Amino acid sequence: MEYDEKLVRFRQAHLNPFNKHLGPRHHEQEPNEKAQEVTSEDTLPELPAGEPEFCYSERMMDLGLSEDHFSRPVGLFLASDVQQLRQAIEECKQVILELPEQSEKQKDAVVRLIHLRLKLQELKDPNEEEPNIRVLLEHRFYKEKSKSVKQTCDKCNTIIWGLIQTWYTCTGCYYRCHSKCLNLISRPCVSSKVSHQAEYELNICPETGLDSQDYRCAECRAPISLRGVPSEARQCDYTGQYYCSHCHWNDLAVIPARVVHNWDFEPRKVSRCSMRYLALMVSRPVLRLREINPLLFNYVEELVEIRKLRQDILLMKPYFITCKEAMEARLLLQLQDRQHFVENDEMYSIQDLLEVHMGRLSCSLTEIHTIFAKHIKLDCERCQAKGFVCELCKEGDVLFPFDSHTSVCNDCSAVFHRDCYYDNSTTCPKCARLTLRKQSLFQEPGLDVDA
């Protein structure tokens, strides 16, 4: 009996850790072993009290098989006391002073300084079990109070039951997660990227291959492959990179590169990070279509119409700025959702192009154009007095630079009938008059000296 106990203890201590089917109390029988077989009905002798039991996970740790070799996400600060945070804040201040002014590195250092100060503020308030504000990887999480709305955790991809679980939402990128998942987050807040680098990837699906990613998810670095592993590789059509199923939920989004190059608005599958970035960027006017794809105006008639309406609105803007009635009526606020329309005629957002494609932007902009023109030409006497009379034919109604049948001199901004201007292709009358006036001003002092 003593021999059996020693044999059991020996096999428990030398269990093969790679055999997943055998527990700590089961063993394989050697082929040349003459000992009696232990059936499933037989019970193994109990170990004496006080003897340490070997378990599978402990043996795995001893062999180094359960180690986490992945580095922690960039920006994750693990300081546990106030003194370490204060020291890190002072070092960050020194780095900011040493970096060049207005450089990208200095901006990133300022963001990190804000993050450290907010983290310090959290540690100074230890009384709250679940703080209302949590700052992590540039996310600014607020505790949600809604108990009835059912959401999905962006980290563990499971349902958030607000009635029994505490959860947070980032105010910048609307990232949602359980309170227990906060410290496991590896994705930085994309709102900081939007504020610092407001630009799109304009190459269509710039794929580099799984080998360039070391066969790991581009975000969380989990092992992925096209086949052979539990986590399938899913490609993001915006970045061209591959992600695991936790970071890529097969969300659909319109790809900016396909819009500006192919006028293609079909939604494609993108990762969660790309989806949130595109959602935050959708209304930002960062696309200069004339430089990216000037031929697009030759094939999309609606873009030509929109460009003409925007040019007219820019010509109307000086009338409104100098008109008291227009300022009181706040006419320019009709375009408050598209402030770039009263600043230039070149920049577009993806939201603008989407509405051009659906035919909505042309209708709404034409309506606003009509309201603006009505104020200048009919409703306001001050604005009417700023009109022009064609100096070539001296006939017809008062002209304005945004009228469709007029032409504007590039030098003096005088307005003429289009037919009159092109039929009399000589010098502009107003330009000639201004030239004579300048010559007379230069000659008068000379005449006084001779006299």
Swiss-Prot record:
Listed InterPro entries: C1-like_sf (IPR046349), DEF8 (IPR051366), DEF8_C1 (IPR047983), PE/DAG-bd (IPR002219), RH_dom (IPR025258)
Top-level taxon in the UniProt lineage: Eukaryota
GO BP term, pick one: positive regulation of ruffle assembly
Parts of the chain that traverse the membrane: none
Any one GO molecular function term: zinc ion binding
UniProt entry keywords in alphabetical sequence: Metal-binding, Phosphoprotein, Repeat, Zinc, Zinc-finger
Coiled coil (UniProt feature): none
Protein name: Differentially expressed in FDCP 8 homolog
Encoding gene (name): Def8
